[in-house]
Amino acid sequence: MRATVVRYEIKPERADENQALIEAVFADLEERQPEGFTYKAFRLEDGVRFVHVVVEHDDVENRDSLADVPAFQAFVADIGDRCVAPPVPSGATVVGAYH
């Protein structure tokens, strides 16, 4: 499994808009049911920092891509305008998981 963690801070006046765009991504994912990855997004307690975690599963032969989801494309299209600073992606190793 390969994981990516993305952290960023949104301009306070755009935080609710950012959350709405994220919710649209999850609605699109629910409709499309892509396979091969797990995706979670978190809005931190301060209301302006967000964390996204994508885990790509090794056991799927024809993995779908989050980047192919139209609502995700809309979400990332102007992320730079909504952010205080550019998002910071980091590769991560899954040490453990519980469902």
Put a short name on every predicted segment.
Residues R2, Q33, D46-V48:
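Residue-level preference for beta-strand/loop junctions
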Residues R2-Y8:
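Active-site-flanking beta-strand signature of metal-NTP-handling nucleotidyl enzymes
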Residues V6, N18, Y39, H52-E56:
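Polar/charged side chains located within well-ordered beta-strands of beta-rich proteins
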Residues E9-A20:
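Short, surface-exposed ligand-recognition loops at beta-strand->loop->(often short) alpha-helix junctions
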Residues P12, G47-R49, H57-N62:
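Short, charged/polar surface micro-motifs in flexible loops or helix N-caps
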Residues A24, D28-T38, V55-S90:
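An amphipathic, aromatic/His-enriched active-site/gating alpha helix that lines ligand/cofactor pockets
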Residues F42-L44:
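Short beta-strand micro-motifs enriched in acidic
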Residues A92-H99:
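Short, low-order "capping/linker" segments at domain edges
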